[in-house]
From Swiss-Prot:
The lineage of its organism: Eukaryota, Metazoa, Chordata, Craniata, Vertebrata. Disulfide bonds: none annotated. One of its GO terms (molecular function) is GTPase activator activity. SUPFAM superfamilies: Ypt/Rab-GAP domain of gyp1p. The modification Phosphoserine is found at S473, S480. Interacts with ARF6. Residues 343-516 form the TLDc domain. This is TBC1 domain family member 24. GO terms for cellular component: cell projection; cytoplasmic vesicle membrane; plasma membrane; presynapse. It comes from Bos taurus (Bovine). A 1,2-diacyl-sn-glycero-3-phospho-(1D-myo-inositol) binds at K36, R40, K238, R242, R293, L294, F295, S296, R297. It is a peripheral membrane protein. It comes from the Eukaryota. Gene3D superfamilies: Ypt/Rab-GAP domain of gyp1p, domain 3.
Length: 516
């Protein structure tokens, strides 16, 4: 067997144990579905040469804007940009945000080449303002490129993709932050056990999730990252969410019940990812990732758009230049003790609730709209205080000191659309919870995808009034991204509707479903 034909940028001694060359030498399929299966199965992962051919083909087929820099551009500009500096001393572009170049079994020449390529990309893409994932992408592509110019061209095609439905890498601080928020939403939905652990061991769980791209682009060992990148080039950005969720699931499985290795869970997760080979193989990691029944691409795109809108409304679109990624002031705003007051829950309990709500709403402080101590027990007054606000959080304290509540995604004014009859409304983002005697969140088990469909009138059902309750809300202009969505497929029109309110009762729940 002939040894792999590594290029001059690769440390051959390290590569022999990182990625073998034992597989097939050619790929003949052209159908997307077959490519997906082969990528997930690692068909070209066993052949260093074949992987290079596949990358060349897949990147060549990326639809790009008309003027996209190619290898000839690199040859023209690299001398002017680098000058007489040695490659090792070249500064990294500002858009990588002090992200270090992963070694990925590159030799010193290869690491210097990555710096040169990044600087030339910065010269040709002035619109790319924040892209900490790019050093890892360039370092991997350099393995499978004949020279620096070819690697530059491949990276440029990834950045220049003009297919709006095919997002590849975040290129602005706004896109990066909204992706972090979207990942937090997905963790909240699909990794509840891990999320509960994160809430328990970290002061700000959102800071932990803001590190998710670093797990993939930098901390994962080369053989793992290459397998992820194989599938990423075929299937796109959603794969990154899947793998990051799988990493968090494995971290929870290994570390649950064990003391953390440091007082910083972010550092513990990074260390876990670096040594992930001790826990799971690349095959098992991808198997776990694709076993998650994730939202569709369209649904994730809607969630991403809603998170971007929330950031824009907060005026958060660019990163403060003086703050590094590891020390930057995170945009997520926790519940501040000085600005929060409730007769039912304290700041710690409200922060627990805030860790469950969609991240675009966790940007804001809760605002007290209604309290039975202040406003009495009139439902009319309750509706008057809450109308025009969404979402709201309902808190109830019983005479036995038990505390429960619900996160309600939709404006209570929706109840007026039923012509005086009682009817259910709401979206699949709603949930109920208990804080005393123990903390527990309950989801609506029927819901697989949130949607607002046509309300369905039901017969009135009365519920006894509670001794004390209050409602907190976000600004009225923060609408759920699913309010205008009509494309989700649900078995029943009423399965995402479980808010109802009339003149004599208020109902959270639905006779057709179950809270668990």
């Amino acid at each position: 067997m002939h040894p792999p034909a590594y290029n001059c940028f690769v440390d051959r001694d390290k590569m022999d144990s990182a990625i073998p060359d034992l597989g097939p030498k050619e790929l003949s399929c052209t159908e997307l579905q077959e490519l997906k299966q082969l990528a997930r199965q690692g068909y070209w992962a066993r052949s260093y040469a074949l992987r290079g051919q596949v990358y060349q083909r897949l990147i060549r087929d990326i639809p790009c804007r008309t003027v996209t820099p190619d290898a000839s551009v690199y040859r023209d500009i690299v001398g002017k940009i680098v000058g007489k500096h040695s490659s090792a001393s070249l500064p990294l572009p500002e858009f990588v945000d002090n992200t270090q170049v992963p070694s990925y079994c590159l030799n010193s020449k290869g690491e210097g080449a990555v710096r040169k390529i990044l600087l030339c990309i910065s010269n040709q893409f002035p619109d790319v303002s924040f892209c900490p994932a790019l050093p890892a992408v360039v370092a991997l592509l350099l393995h499978y490129s004949a020279d620096e110019a070819e690697c530059f061209e491949k990276a440029c095609r990834i950045l220049a993709c003009n297919d709006s439905s095919r997002k590849l890498v975040d290129q602005s601080f706004l896109a990066f932050e909204s992706s972090c928020m979207t990942f937090g939403d997905l963790v909240n939905k699909y990794c509840q056990a891990a999320h509960k652990l994160m809430v328990a061991v970290s002061e700000d769980v959102l800071q932990v999730y803001a590190d998710w791209q670093r797990w993939l682009f930098g901390e994962l060992p080369l053989s793992y990252f290459a397998r992820v990148f194989d599938v990423f080039l075929v299937e796109g950005y959603k794969v990154l969410y899947r793998v990051a969720l799988a990493i968090l699931k494995f971290f929870h499985k290994v570390r649950a019940g064990q003391p953390l290795e440091s007082d910083n869970v972010k550092q513990d997760i990074r260390a876990f990812v670096r040594d992930i080979a001790k826990t799971v193989s690349p095959e098992k990691l991808l198997e776990k990732a694709f076993a998650i029944r994730l939202f569709s691409r369209k649904e994730i795109q809607l969630l991403q758009m809603a998170n971007e809108k929330a950031l824009k409304q907060k005026g958060i679109t660019v990163k403060q230049k003086s703050v590094s990624l590891s020390k930057r002031q995170f945009v997520h705003l926790a519940v501040h003790a000085d600005n929060f007051h409730s007769e039912i829950v304290g700041v710690k309990e409200m922060r627990d609730i805030w860790s469950w709500v969609p991240e675009r709403f966790a940007l804001c402080q809760p605002l007290l709209l209604f309290s039975s101590l202040q406003h009495g027990y009139s439902l009319t007054r309750f509706y008057f205080q809450c109308e025009g606000r969404e979402p709201t959080v309902l808190l109830i304290k019983t005479t036995q000191k038990e505390v429960c509540g619900a996160y309600l995604s939709t404006d209570w004014s929706e109840r007026n659309k039923f012509g005086g009859k009682l009817g259910f409304f709401g979206t699949g983002e709603c949930f109920v919870f208990r804080l005393q005697p123990e903390v527990q969140r309950y989801e609506w088990v029927v819901i697989k995808h949130p949607e607002l469909t046509k309300p369905a009138p039901l017969e009135p059902t009365t519920v006894p009034p509670s001794p004390s309750h209050s409602v907190s809300s976000e600004p009225a202009d923060r609408l759920s991204p699913f309010l205008a969505t009509r494309h989700f497929n649900l078995p029943s029109k009423t399965e995402s509707l479980f808010m109802a309110g009339g003149s004599d009762c208020l109902i959270i729940g639905h006779v057709a479903g179950d809270w668990r």
